[in-house]
Amino acid sequence: MLAGMPSLSHLEQQEAADRIHLLMEQGMSSGEAIARVAQEIREKHQGDQVSVMFDDEDDDEEYQERPDDQADDDSEEDENY
């Protein structure tokens, strides 16, 4: 679970959205409908295991580019200091 919510398939996400819309059409506020559907999902998926993978490749490339750009700026500041 990520932030207390299980990982859902596309179909499960669509069903949840449809359920939220149905509850709202029946007069429930959006916040209450979302909270109710979220609770139903939590109860249905209680005990599920979710694997989370992070893709940090883009962050690493951006970090590698920055030091070169900043190195020139830093050296100019040092001369004027």
Swiss-Prot record:
Domain of life: Bacteria
InterPro entries in alphabetical order: UPF0181
Chain segments carrying region Disordered: 43-81
Biased composition (Acidic residues): 54-63, 70-81
Pfam families, sorted: UPF0181
UniProt record similarity statement: Belongs to the UPF0181 family.
HAMAP family: UPF0181
Record-given protein name: UPF0181 protein Spro_2806
Upper classification of the organism: Bacteria, Pseudomonadati, Pseudomonadota, Gammaproteobacteria, Enterobacterales
